[in-house]
Amino acid sequence: MIEALSRRSILRGILGGSAITVGLPLLDCFLDGNGTALASGAPLPIRFGTWFWGLGHTPGRAIAIKDGTDYAFLENCAALSPFKSQINFFTNFNTPTDGEPNIPHDTGHFAGLAGNCPSAYGDIPSPTFDVLISDAIGQASRFRSLEVTASGNPRDSLSARGTGNFNAAEPSPFRFYTRLFGPEFADPNKADFKPDPRVMVRQSVLSAVKDEASSFAGGLGSADKARMDEYFTSVRQMEQQLNLQMQKPAPAEACKIPASPGENTPIGTEIFTAINTHKIMTQLLVMAVACNQTKVFNMSFSASASQYRKPGDSATNHTLTHEEPVDAALGYQPISDWFATRSMESMATFVDAFAQVREGDGTLLDNCMIFAHTDTNYARLHALDGIPMMSVGKAGGRIKTGMHIAGNGDPVTRVGLTMMQVMGLAVDQWGTRSLKTSKPVTEIVV
Amino acid sequence: MNGKPEWEKGVTMGIGKGTFAPLFVRRLRYCVVALALLIASGILTHVSAEPAKKKTLGLAITAWRTALYETPDGKEECPDGLTLGGDQVWLNMLTPEQRDKVTRHGTVETTQLRDFALERGPHGEDVCWNPAVVNDPPQKTVQGKKSYGVNLDGTDDGHATPRTCAHEKFVTPDGARGIDNQWYRVIGCTYGWRAAGGYTEEMPNGELRDGGHPILVEITGIDDLRNSTNVEVAFYHSTDGMIKDNAGNILPNSSYRVAKDYLYTTHGSIVDGVLTTVPIDIHFPFYAHFMHSERFIKDARLRLDLAPDGKSAAGLVAGYYDLDSFWSYMERIGELFTVAHFDCPALYEAVHRLADGYPDPKTGECTAISAGFSVTAVSGYIIHLDAKTAQASAPAGEVR
Amino acid sequence: MRIFLRHGIAATLALALFGCGPGEPQSPGGAPQVRRLTEEQYRQVIADLFGKDIKVAGHFDPLNRTDGLLEIGASRAAITSSAFEQYDLIARQVAAQVVDADHREVLVPCSPASDSAPDAACAKAFFARIGPLLYRRPLEAKTLERLVDVSGVAAASVHDFYAGLAFGLAGMLETPEFLFVADYTEPDPDRPGGHRLDAYSRASRLSFLLWDTMPDAALMKAAQDGDLNSKRGLRRQVDRMLASPRLDAGVRAFFSDMLGFDTFDTLAKDPIIYPAFVQSVADDAQEQTLRTITNLLIANKGDYRDLFTTRDTVMSGPLGLLYDVPVTKPDGWVPYRFPDDDPRAGIITQLSFVALHSHPGRSSATLRGKAVREIFLCQKVPDPPGNVNFALVQDTKNPNYKTARQRLTAHRSAPTCAGCHKIMDPMGLALENFDGAGQYRTVENDVPIDASGEVDGVKFQGAAELGKVVHDNPVTTSCLVNRLYGYAVGRPPVAGEKDWMKYLQAGFAENGYRVPDLLRLIATSDAFYAIAPAGAQSASEPSPTGARS
């Protein structure tokens, strides 16, 4: 077995110059002296993620807009204040529907994710842009992307390929742990490495599976062909996983295998349970990224019409946003507001977890771009215009941060387009009809 | 008023009470009274007065604990401190050199020394199976004046009667006098029975909560849950377990099939929501420490507070706890003396010395001890299976 | 004699009208479907193939409910990366068990020359036997060859014959041929240029409809012998399958889908408000309704509409807690009949409906009304408007509406709300005697509950009468026909099937609304197997054998 991996052997691919692309794992020896770029001058790999919460903020209690691009976090978002320098806050971007219905807790976020307004619940009209990004940068990782939820419901995932199917979210901390760090995990920091011959056998089996599937797919109609394409993409991802299992993974300084959460970790929609689940899942997810298991991730803190509730309360967050009276003295709905603040506290937990991981001269958060978004501007009215969005992380220095960006009524898709371009996708236009845009938010691009 | 018709006297109508009612009201009164008489005489037979339907309440006992009065620091009831466990008693009998050797300079856990502490009879006998073969320092018994319980012997001062031995009485914390609870006197200062130790009784209660088979109390012939003069009370044992909610509380409305060959019946009455029963001898089974045991209580009677919604009850089972029944349980759990801090020989001696019920005709020594046990219960359906027809019936008219 | 003759004539007429084919309206058929196995079907297939003790430990991606059914969603379902990972994991675990020391004697039909080396002959025997069963059709020669090769290479690599078999088997379990039930077509001899479902696809359609699993040996043989292409042969198989106890599984699977029981997986009740609604209650609630259904529809050959009025059901110990009734066998299931005047009558009043369609901590007249409309009447309720103003609901003079009926008054009076809520709330309000966990109550917040309602002009009082209203509504039975047919073919009925659907509805009525008879009508029809002509769906040329058009 090769003792010291030379850059060349890795670049050539251990599988003897085959056509399979092997992603460059991050080795310190590849970094330049400043730890800010690869020795070759290429930038450090950037990770992309989304963080979703349902039911927005209480209007007037999220941020205070100041002169220029300055802003300050208000009560709902107080927990995010320590990370303000990493966060861009987008306001006043709208969601034109071109006559499609405003499907409550659905149109709001899918418009900005898929560039298209859905026509009914369950209709996911085009791929969400996290999938486009993971197709571009995620193929060489063990997982093309990771979808997680704190709600206990695997349907609470917003990541979809546009065939009408979504990428189910992992709801169980124990199962997530087993998937990430169980028997199939290759510890990048383990000194010895012996490729398992059985993995090569599995590779040849998968090859036979693909042959079988090709003749199956040959006779299908066009709609079914698209589903078969997704099948083949999935098989290729499994092949990639097996490829990686055949090589010694590059050491990852920040990778420390976490303790397994208990098999009976409570999962549920009681708010404190969900907050706890989110915390555990965040720890696992961050470590998965730090151990180079994936470059793309999607966390749903809650469903869009969040069913979270305080223990003993008969009303869920969603019900409250509609039925709770506006307090005459306060001017807002107090319990709904309470939930909004809890959501932002969990977002802060998420952001902080990335900020705690050292990478090169900075942190993992510095090399991430996370799209934090929600489904409405004012849940009580299912308001679509001005839905708050944030970018979190410096994307390896490719974006400026700490700014408030006013959208002037432009479509929300400008943000998704910007993010795809920042992640290196060759896309200059995105979205359909009034959501179509070719104008990135250049203010944040370096 | 003079000249009042005979049939108007003694009929309280409430109309114009105490004032002179206008004529039409008086006429109305006459009509109503006449109607009442006609009904009573049976002339208007389609208006019938049906007796109220009798109701049944089924209860499953969810926990059983000695009704133990204790203060947080124990000083009031146990001024001399709590009892020592048999291991400590034994260690105290050793010289310092012997103690040091046997504990390997104090490094060996006393639970590991348990077997030595148990088998220390003159011929190596287990002193819980043979408690009388050694003379241990006496049990620390309750010195306080307060206890829960009931006046079992009917006397004010505990003097000896043909059926009881002389003993001291207690006063309840609420001030009720004449309480017989010698059992409390014996074990009230033993860690394993007190709340902090909770061992000897929490094990069977835990078994019960984890799907164990409860004792059922079926009260039939109830007119009204607050007051019923004569009710039948039956005790059954169930073959079905109780169901818990996610917080571990036993849920009401479960169904329990009665086991064959276990039945005790008595009468009782409910006054202001409290059921009291006529004493009978009852064997109460329980499961603990991997074995079946029972508490045989002579003159057992209930005093249960029934919740107004009919979903639960709590109160006392009091009577004379048969000493043989008690000891047949203790001798099999002797090994718990290290964690429950009791000493078998001392406990055996104390419970026999302080026993106050059912004197042995030959020796005059009392063979049972006055006791009070607090019980909690939830309501449920008691299912009687008819062996012949395999039909099942649940008593009609369940109380809710 | 004359009576017999009259009945005989009537029977013959009925048979002629509804059983003989010529009276049956044509169906243009739909596109060939490719349906992903549901989790239940996957597990049942593994059990049928390898035995009940083979553990399937993994999780399955949820299906999307489409046109009211998960089974139609299965026709659109794809396999994502994470789903494929799970299939791969399950496949390897199943395969490992199949060849382990405990199972190989029974499941591997031969012994290799050596345990630690390849044995092509034995591998061939194994795959030749298991292949057609897994793929639900004959194995192509080149596929068999490939399997023997792969397992041979594997066996040589790890010096273990059985491990080699397991690698090959695991591969089979993650191919689309296994994971999807696909419609294979062949040229139709009766319609030159046209195509029809081939015999094995007919067998699969039939088997998954009636038994929710792969075709058994007898059905496979019938397919092989060409019996399924003749009405007589088809009817013989259908009658055999309808008479089998395995029909229960098929009927349960259908109703489980139609009633939306998949949402039980994520059903949460607040443990403080409803402490008695523990997991065993949720599990038993589904079972209770499914048993009520199979008892009435299959065992008692009853009228489908009676599901909404029947007081006969079953009880378990945990359910007795919620229903507050005595259960004479608390550790099992016992028949139970609610008294004649009891508000519990019909499956709409059972826990599986009222508890499922509620919030975690309170009931919901709107969710229940919507569910009655969408599930039992196939009436789609429009989505709520996006810009609704809830200020009307939040009357500051009465911040605490005492009963749901009071709270929902605004729903029915405000113009933007009333249009839709008028068709939902009145039904749901009749069920308000059942709280969010399905427990019976007469008051809410100390105010007596008024369980009166009105549906499409018919007034009623209370849950039992709501059941009667649904029983009597003609839409109820046509909805069931619509759903069952959609479940059968994996797609909603197409425009050209209007007459066929009317025919099915008439047949359902003629047969006293008996579901097994409706199944027979569907399963023996031409429509069930009709495939839209090639060219309408795709432009690719059909292959000579066994390819889809």
Residues of each region from the PLM?
Chain B
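Extracytosolic secretory-pathway proteins
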Residues: E50-R400
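Bacterial N-terminal signal peptides that target proteins for export
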Residues: G16-V32
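Bacterial N-terminal signal peptides
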Residues: Y30-G42
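Sec/Tat signal peptide C-region and signal peptidase I cleavage site
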Residues: T45-A49
